[in-house]
UniProtKB/Swiss-Prot annotation:
GO biological process: one example: protein import
Gene behind this protein: tolB
Keyword Cell division: yes
HAMAP family from the UniProt entry: TolB
Keywords (A to Z) from UniProt: Cell cycle, Cell division, Periplasm, Signal
Organism of derivation: Shewanella pealeana (strain ATCC 700345 / ANG-SQ1)
Signal sequence, renumbered to the chain: 1-21
Main subcellular location of this protein, as a coarse class: periplasm
InterPro entries for this protein: 6-blade_b-propeller_TolB-like, PD40, Tol-Pal_TolB, TolB_N
Family: Belongs to the TolB family.
Subcellular location(s) per record: Periplasm
Descriptive protein name: Tol-Pal system protein TolB
Length: 440
């Protein structure tokens, strides 16, 4: 519960925004292989209409994770229950699910509500002996007091708990995504946006008549680094998403691009061409001191930090075509990582540092691929068109990326094993350059 205060502060900062999904999530593959789970609609214990149904958020989260497949409500043997005391294990003997989520919502005075939920081990319930206590069936049980405006955010919190308890992996439902929306024909067509991972609570950080690109989150989730051409040249900025305060980090002649925060949040790795060819540099955010990392006549670009902060993944053409390399900051030692396919570029690193995710070109097709750094096994994850800009969820289970669908730039998502796929179409404009936030 130590993160609850931080979560409540974050939700209060965005709860005044309209509840609207700017990005839909359309699941296209992977439902059949998901693990079955039952989510009983939470019981309303007040008079009048319920503000909103938190369990709907939980069901959607679990389905979108690609890991779980919530059962249809009409197929559930019990509905209208919210506690273990009301749970009838005998009624659930034939239900194909591994767990049951149930809960209640009760007015608590003013605009406050007491929300309770329980996570029941259905497999254990179906196998239980006479000597087993019903309390042994409870995997987790919690309650908290929130406002109506916090219902959706707390639904994500419940989903995080359920996901972690059943998989051992931290849930990433209380995260956000930054992206660029382009509406051609408007006076200021470029918008830097952030939204909850599921497209709700969209917020515009910046609008410009000139291109915006390459947003990247700070490790604390408080700021974004990005490239802006608002002054008719490429410049790198860092902007606090809550105070809106902006700081210009680099504004050299030529390329100022591909900013990405170091794991400690104190530096940016960037691509600059101030000394000739595009090269990778590290900039101290506080002092603006610059250290050159690469020095080669070929193009070096698109840096990404390994979790230990001691090395970078970069795209380099020093071998004749774009490939991914690892460069160590202290020694300058550089080694090539990718060899399969015509091109490999735009790399990201999994949170555990064991895999890289990147754009792979084979036979002229650009798709998202993953490579295990120990075995060097590469797997192409997607079959969409003109894929670009992969960004990994902070728990390492999903990748969000840009692609083209029906002639329009959209976002899409794929699980790290390639089994689950989803498309995230926007209502208006083209969407590109996604960046998944850290845990918030």
């Amino acid at each position: 519960m130590k993160n609850l205060g931080k979560w409540l502060l974050t939700s209060l900062l965005i709860c005044s925004m309209p509840v609207k999904a700017a990005l839909d999530i359309i699941i296209t593959e992977g439902v059949d292989a998901a693990r079955p789970i039952a989510v009983i609609p939470f019981v309303w214990q007040g008079t009048g209409p319920m503000p909103s149904q938190i369990s709907d958020v939980v069901m959607s989260d679990l389905a979108r994770s690609g890991t779980f497949s919530p059962a249809d409500e009409l197929s559930l043997p019990q509905r209208g229950i919210s506690t273990l005391a009301q749970f009838n294990a005998s009624a659930w003997m034939a239900q194909p699910a591994e767990a049951v989520v149930m809960g209640s919502i009760k007015p608590y005075g003013g605009d406050k509500y007491l929300v309770s939920f329980e996570l029941i081990d259905l497999v254990k319930a179906q196998l239980q002996s006479d000597s087993m206590s019903t309390k042994d069936l409870v995997i987790d049980s919690r309650e908290t007091v929130i406002s109506a405006a916090q219902f959706r955010q707390y639904g994500h919190r419940i989903s995080d708990v359920v996901y972690e308890k059943l998989t051992g992996i931290r849930g990433a439902f209380l995260t956000r995504v930054a992206y660029v929306v382009v509406n051609h024909g408007e006076k200021s067509p470029y918008k830097l946006m952030i939204a909850d991972y599921d497209g709700y609570n969209e917020q515009m950080l910046l609008r410009s008549p000139e291109p915006l690109m390459s947003p990247s989150w700070s490790p604390d989730g408080q700021s974004l680094a990005y490239v802006s051409f608002e002054n008719r040249k490429a410049e790198v900025f860092v902007q606090n998403i809550y105070t809106q305060q902006r700081t210009k980090i680099t504004s050299f002649d030529g390329i100022n691009g591909a900013p990405v925060f170091s794991p400690d949040g104190k530096k940016l790795a960037v691509t600059l061409s101030k000394d000739g060819q595009p090269e990778v540099y590290v900039v101290d955010i506080a002092t603006k001191a610059i250290k050159r990392v690469t020095n080669h006549y070929a193009i070096d670009t698109e840096p990404s930090w390994f979790p230990d902060g001691k090395s970078l993944l970069i795209t380099s053409e020093r071998g004749g075509r774009p490939q991914l390399y690892r460069v160590f900051l202290d020694s300058g030692k550089i080694s090539r990582l990718t060899f399969e396919g015509e091109w490999n570029l735009g790399g990201s690193i999994s949170p555990d540092g064991r895999s890289i995710i990147f754009v792979n070109r084979i036979n002229g097709k650009f798709n998202i691929a993953r490579m295990d750094l120990e075995t060097r096994f590469m797997q192409v994850l997607t079959s969409t068109r003109l894929d670009e800009s992969p960004s990994v969820a902070p728990n390492g289970t999903m990748v969000i990326y840009g692609t083209t669908y029906q002639g329009k730039q959209v976002l899409a998502a794929v699980s790290m094993d390639g089994r689950f796929k989803a498309r995230l179409p926007a209502g208006q404009g083209e969407v590109k350059s996604p960046s998944w936030s850290p845990f918030l």
